[in-house]
Amino acid sequence: MKFKYLSTPLLFSALLFSACSSVNVGANLKSLIKETTDQDLDLSESVSTSEGKKNLISSLKKSYETNPSKTASVLLNAWKQSVENGQIESSETNWTNWKFP
């Protein structure tokens, strides 16, 4: 049970940063963040630097506090498009090789 909680942030960050690279979803995500936090973030720069990743995550937290359903919808749509386009590698989502304690 502990493993499930420990692996969640790692999986979430891999899905988040691969999802943010999608062009269509990037525009939706950028407008969502601008609506809720009044910040105009460059997503391509945010994903490539550690400081940018921290800013992106804090902006998404603020956005989720303001409008949770829209934020979740945009992120799930981004993840779906990333999987469909093959941007998320199978090693990140392959649960069959994991050893549970």
From Swiss-Prot:
GO cellular component: plasma membrane
Keywords attached to this entry: Cell membrane, Lipoprotein, Membrane, Palmitate, Signal
Membrane topology annotation: Lipid-anchor
Major localization listed first in the record, in broad terms: membrane
Subcellular location: Cell membrane
Keyword Signal carried by entry: yes
Short name of one Pfam family: Lipoprotein_3
PROSITE patterns tied to this protein: PROKAR_LIPOPROTEIN
The family this protein is said to belong to: Belongs to the MG439/MG440 family.
Protein name (database record): Uncharacterized lipoprotein MPN_650
Species whose genome carries this gene: Mycoplasma pneumoniae (strain ATCC 29342 / M129 / Subtype 1)
